[in-house]
Amino acid sequence: MSERIDISIELNGQQLDFCIPTEITMGRFTELMHQVLKGGVMPQNWTLKLKDKNIKVDDTDLIKELPIGSGDVFCILPTQERQENLNENI
């Protein structure tokens, strides 16, 4: 597996492209995205969701151990919106 993958982050109807290392945890990836995107229009409380793939991800999971690859898109969801989204799936 490659040491880096190319992913997109969907925020406010736009997609931002990033090249990220696969040797980091999802928790660290989320922290880095918060630092990079905090100058933009970010919700106060948010979470990342993988678009078009229904997988359960924990903050301690390494990206290289997940079914995530180049071309995947992550959505930034406000925490409240995420809860409503989860309720729809029940």
Swiss-Prot record:
<protein>
    <recommendedName>
        <fullName>Uncharacterized protein CA_C3711</fullName>
    </recommendedName>
</protein>
<dbReference type="Pfam" id="PF08817">
    <property type="entry name" value="YukD"/>
</dbReference>
<dbReference type="InterPro" id="IPR024962">
    <property type="entry name" value="YukD-like"/>
</dbReference>
